[in-house]
Amino acid sequence: MPAVDRFRQADRNPPSTQADGLKVTVLVLFVVVFLLPPALAATLHSRNRIVDWRNADRSSAGLLPPALPQTPAVVRIFSARTVRWRGIVATHSWIVLKSAGAANYSRFDYTAWGEPIWVDRFIPDGRWFGRMPELVFAADGTNAERMIPLIRQAVRDYAYPNTGDYRAWPGPNSNTFVAAIIAAVPGMRAALPPTAVGKDFPIDCRWVGLTPSGTGIRFNLGGYLGIAVGWVEGFEVNLLCAVAGVDIRRPAIKLPGLGRLGISSTPRS
């Protein structure tokens, strides 16, 4: 075949061929990133299912030292799988703090039961209805002491404090609450896990803004769709609250349902 004919044949339908190839690639990526991980998470959840969640273990997970007057200030963020089928893809987050000289911890949750902001209703590092909590953020000493009044003020100023404000999806829920506190406290460079459904709900209703850690920018459509790029958060894509992404700072991949796979993201301050 002459060279000219070969070029003519190659030029006949390249756009459609390339478009078809792109569609297949996008479809494969969608299945691998957004469908397979939740399916695997569902399988794992069924094997470790807690049947009677109302009577499930809520005892201390042993993640906090005893609260003694002589111990320094402490700030912690924990996250644990939620109850029933929602635990396949979602976690519940909360904040714990102790001032220097205090003999007890204070725990702040945001729930669907009654007035949503709950204080000291659960054991500070307790299992969440049988599910082991994960440490998300830790600060101690003078840095924690600096954060504590800012955290308390952020709780008082939270935009959704009333009965009926809670919405499991896309927010505001417990993860929205904790993300808002992170955003309100300078230096609290924490990133909630990708399974923290609701963390991307914009309480200020803005489409563009800083990430909660203040180290990046995010584009957000009501918590349903969005993209975030930040030094602490890494690169994240939010599709109907299913979050996938990568973390370069502490190498890991983030997948819906499965969560973060890689080096721990827990920073200490």
Regions found by a protein language model. Name each.
Residues 2-8:
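N-terminal intrinsically disordered, acidic low-complexity segments at the extreme N-terminus
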Residues 11-60, 159-269:
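Activation targets extended, charge/polar-rich intrinsically disordered C-terminal tails
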Residues 46-142, 164-168, 243-257:
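Glycine-rich catalytic cores of cysteine/serine-nucleophile enzymes that process amide/ester linkages
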Residues 92, 146, 150, 173-180:
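Extracytoplasmic/secreted proteins, especially bacterial periplasmic and envelope-associated proteins
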Residues 96-97, 155, 182-185:
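Hydrophobic, Leu/Ile/Phe/Ala-enriched alpha-helical segments that form helix-helix packing faces
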Residues 140-159:
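A structural motif
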